Amino acid sequence: MLLILGHMVNDMFSNLLSGLLPIFTVLFDLSYVLAGLVAMVFSVTSSLLQPLLGRWFDRTQTTWLLEGGLALNCFGMSLVGISPNYVVLLFLVGTAGIGTAAFHPPAFSTVARSSSASRGGSMGVFLSGGNAGFFLGPIVAGLLVSAFGLQGTLLLLPIGMLTALLLLRVRVSERPEPSLTKSTQPPNRRLLGLLATITALRSITIQVGVTFLPLYLVAKGESLLVATGVASIWLGVGVLGQIAGGHLSDRIGRRPVIVFSLFVGAAIFYGFLMTTGLISIILLALSGGVLFASWSVIVTMASEAAPDNVGAVSGLMLGFSIGVGGLAALGFGGTADMLGLQTAFYIFGAFAIGGGMLSLFLPKDTGDVGSVMVVK
């Protein structure tokens, strides 16, 4: 439970930026490209370091990465509200990115190694904590700014630091002995490469949604509070999809869930873009539930493909997810500057469909470790 709480708080801080970006865009007179660069700095700093820190954790079991990473993420994001200029904003966002890069590998590794009977379900529950944090991030940002102005982000600093202190207990209560979890199974590099590519394509669609949905809704005439609230609904239903996808993959297999999630989720998201009013909000929520259902399944499948390198593999998957998504945010911003936000969403939604096409080449399985591992 402490890991789920820590994941929720960590990812809440990570997604504060989504709710604050419309304000910084006005405050610093940013184009969509420069707004996308803010998201990209966070994404690139975390994605470049995450696989390296994951590999280091697999070899050394360095315990302080978990709570230290959360504390650094919290520190950087809590201070963004008092950024005097754009350069300082980029520096603080980059600092937070380093923190989340340190947090995730030991957290993923602990979950994967401590749950063997139903990896998909356990990973889904753990990842739902992160999605819950993503859901809360824009809402918390909107409420704080409405009540206290941008400097209200400082009020979150004690929450993050207290949670980091609580994670010290994970050292003795939830972290397994690595010597008891070793396997002789070599990593399935071909499968890992395919999963990383699917992750990258999927993340392009999702990251531009996380970053630009509030801006899109504000451009449509909604207030910042309504825009961040509606965007959070997308992420909130994604929490349920994350849990459902993980448990369903334990029953019917990993590949069917991933294929359905990417094809159907993208189709529903296009429906959101084509409609207005209540129907549009319902379709947006449904697309979140379906699109996010694939993430826990992909991470589980990757950890099964390399059981002795879960930290490195989870870092690779999340690094691809955050890094490519961040680069996509910059590209999306440029496209939106030229063609408009709605046209840019139409273009970038197609990447999830590309991920769905590649997922057809994943091995057939029944959700157990062996069926994944024997595929060459």
Describe each PLM feature range.
Residues 307-338:
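A late C-terminal transmembrane helix in Major Facilitator Superfamily
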